[in-house]
């Protein structure tokens, strides 16, 4: 699991916050990539995963805190991420270097304005999702 985001920009920091919640509490590798996920590509390639789940704040129809699963191709094709740089290159590199299936677990942010802390709706979603992951109660991931 690759968690992305900037903790200095409100809900954009949901990835690193989620990584902190899960690290050491699940049976798979959780990487806090912060604002530079490209710096973790070597680590990920050495792990030889068959599936990579990228956790990030993503814009889509719905309410803040809503979750949507995207395929790597889906996110790479358009500007739905909160980041200025398209994640397309990262996704393509990870797919090429690992052969892994790549999914994006997108959580709709309420705000990505400067400032620390998550909105209540995003924090509630992360807590519920972390609880389910720690108890291994989630079904197989499928892109929407």
Language model regions located:
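N-terminal catalytic or cofactor-binding beta/alpha core of small enzyme domains
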Residues: 1-109, 116-144
